[in-house]
């Protein structure tokens, strides 16, 4: 893929993540976070190109969200680490079905911890409960919804986003 197409694809993924997060903002921010846009983190299984777009999309959404600079910093870092872990999982685990399930759990663990601690600090919420609530939202979106979504689009991914 040439440089222009890579930039456009990265921008499109960032815009899709940010827009999806902000359209359902009441569900996207808070101790229960059901960010439907988090389904997109599993696209990193297909190409590292998505790492930048997803991280940028999270940064944009958090800039416009209610949790301030802490979310811009820590939310973006959490997404970046999660997407990197998703990308590297099939490099370590060769069975594609197992790799998909394990990859889907990284955002649950990483965001649960980082965002849970951040929200607990910002809003004086109980730490363990807040970590659990954030992790639960991630698990529902990324594993329960995301895994079937990825299994559905997997045969079509080259047609949906050509030249990967």
Predicted feature residues:
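Small-polar-interrupted transmembrane alpha-helices in polytopic inner-membrane proteins
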Residues: 17, 54-62
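Hydrophobic transmembrane alpha-helices
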Residues: 1-45, 49
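Membrane-helix interface "capping/anchor" motifs
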Residues: 44-54, 94-99
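Membrane-embedded alpha-helical hairpins and interfacial helices in multi-pass inner-membrane proteins
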Residues: 26-31, 39, 60-74, 78-164
């Amino acid at each position: 893929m040439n440089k222009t197409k890579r930039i456009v694809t990265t921008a499109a993924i960032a815009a899709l993540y940010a827009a999806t997060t902000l359209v359902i903002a009441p569900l996207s921010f808070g101790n229960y976070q059901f960010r439907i846009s988090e389904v997109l983190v599993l696209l990193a299984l297909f190409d590292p190109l998505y790492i930048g777009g997803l991280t940028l999309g999270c940064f944009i959404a958090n800039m416009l969200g209610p949790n301030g600079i802490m979310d811009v910093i820590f939310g973006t870092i959490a997404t970046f680490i999660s997407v990197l872990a998703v990308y590297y999982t099939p490099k370590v685990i060769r069975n594609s079905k197992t790799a998909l399930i394990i990859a889907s759990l990284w955002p649950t663990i990483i965001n649960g911890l980082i965002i849970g601690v951040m929200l607990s600090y910002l809003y004086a919420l109980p730490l363990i409960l807040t970590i659990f609530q954030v992790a639960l939202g991630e698990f529902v979106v990324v594993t329960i919804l995301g895994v079937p979504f990825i299994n559905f689009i997997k045969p079509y991914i080259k047609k949906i986003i050509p030249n990967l």
